[in-house]
Amino acid sequence: MVAHLQPPKIIETCHISPPKGTVPSTTLPLTFFDAPWLSLPLADSLFFFSYQNSTESFLQDFVPNLKHSLSITLQHFFPYAGKLIIPPRPDPPYLHYNDGQDSLVFTVAESTETDFDQLKSDSPKDISVLHGVLPKLPPPHVSPEGIQMRPIMAMQVTIFPGAGICIGNSATHVVADGVTFSHFMKYWMSLTKSSGKDPATVLLPSLPIHSCRNMIKDPGEVGAGHLERFWSQNSAKHSSHVTPENMVRATFTLSRKQIDNLKSWVTEQSENQSPVSTFVVTLAFIWVSLIKTLVQDSETKANEEDKDEVFHLMINVDCRNRLKYTQPIPQTYFGNCMAPGIVSVKKHDLLGEKCVLAASDAITARIKDMLSSDLLKTAPRWGQGVRKWVMSHYPTSIAGAPKLGLYDMDFGLGKPCKMEIVHIETGGSIAFSESRDGSNGVEIGIALEKKKMDVFDSILQQGIKKFAT
């Protein structure tokens, strides 16, 4: 297990912004989809790529193109280079980009004392080992008038000479969700990879759309409620990593065959014999394995009186093209546009003989209910479900999704040899992505105490064997 990461040597820290004059100074309001993220930790991710060249080649041949393409990308994804502005209450926070002044911090670093292969491995590693290759988001600036200005994003690219490169990102989630972040990364990747080619021959992703923020109307003071909670906390406190002790992170992959075995079992056991999706059955299996791990370690595991206790899982449904406004929110909308849904299953069902079926049925029912309902009408009740989730034992949520295509990020070096969603370590999250080998499997990231990780691994392997027979 990787126990410690020697801090990389900082080669350069600079500021990257859109080309001057290409984006006018712009203010964007926060929507009721953005407001819940005001008080939550940063969203951090790492992409590892094989790279056999020297530091000199990296600095001369790769970094300049990476910087230039990032600048062009920020011309279209400019809020990432801007600030989150937090005025004194009662004025609401908003996003602002100031042409010629705002930028994101871009760090170039070198690591010569850490084994790249161990760092990107799937095996358990202390959660702190990845923090050295994460960028440091600058602290907020507070004006004499008490207006707080928070940077939104920072990037860091670290070379491990002769072995690989890591591109790290840290951002406040209030500006946009994973759909937007994936869009941003793929646009940047496409520009970087196409360097030197005729622009007319380069196929780039569609441009993001910012203009429809004003049409996202709050259906019932949803955003106001989140603002009140944000103000009641210490809004001057800048969200950052608080590293729990004795925690490790590990990656597990379910192959296509293993997933198909799970799907067949669930379909056979289901009363209506309905087929189940890869996402649902994988999530059900991992959630059950995680809850079994946590309950097994709990002092209350033998208590019969808590058999009717309910465990909760938070899922998210993308509301793009689903909200009943005059016009739909387009798929390329820049911002947060996710509706939270709470899946609830009783303890005795989630730990019983047909636990995966119970979890799968509950997840499927919740998704169908959300997709068939008027999401705007249900929005005022989302907070009730989230509060119930927060107050429960072992609240679990999801980060990422296989459909985001997070391994489809070729900067001219080939696809990533590993991707990590780092912020799952802040508690209770399961990271999901497509498997990196392109076999239609699913990759899962988990953060737990070392002892619990061993238990989780054992329970997971037992489950895989059970459903293989």
From Swiss-Prot:
UniProt-listed Pfam families: Transferase
EC number(s) on file: 2.3.1.-
Keyword flag Transferase: yes
Keywords noted in UniProt: Acetylation, Acyltransferase, Transferase
Residues modified to N-acetylmethionine: 1
InterPro entries, per database record: CAT-like_dom_sf, Plant_metabolite_acyltrans
Record-linked Gene3D superfamilies: Chloramphenicol acetyltransferase-like domain
GO molecular function, one term: acyltransferase activity, transferring groups other than amino-acyl groups
KO phenotype (gene knockout): No visible phenotype, probably due to the redundancy with 3AT2.
Induction of expression: Up-regulated by high sucrose and by low phosphate stresses.
Active site: 173, 410
Tissue expr: Highly expressed in flowers, leaves and roots. Lower levels of expression in stems and siliques.
Entry function: Involved in the acylation of the 6'' position of the 3-O-glucose residue of anthocyanin. Also able to use flavonol 3-glucosides as the acyl acceptor.
Family: Belongs to the plant acyltransferase family.
Name the record gives this protein: Coumaroyl-CoA:anthocyanidin 3-O-glucoside-6''-O-coumaroyltransferase 1
Organism: Arabidopsis thaliana
Gene that this polypeptide is encoded by: 3AT1
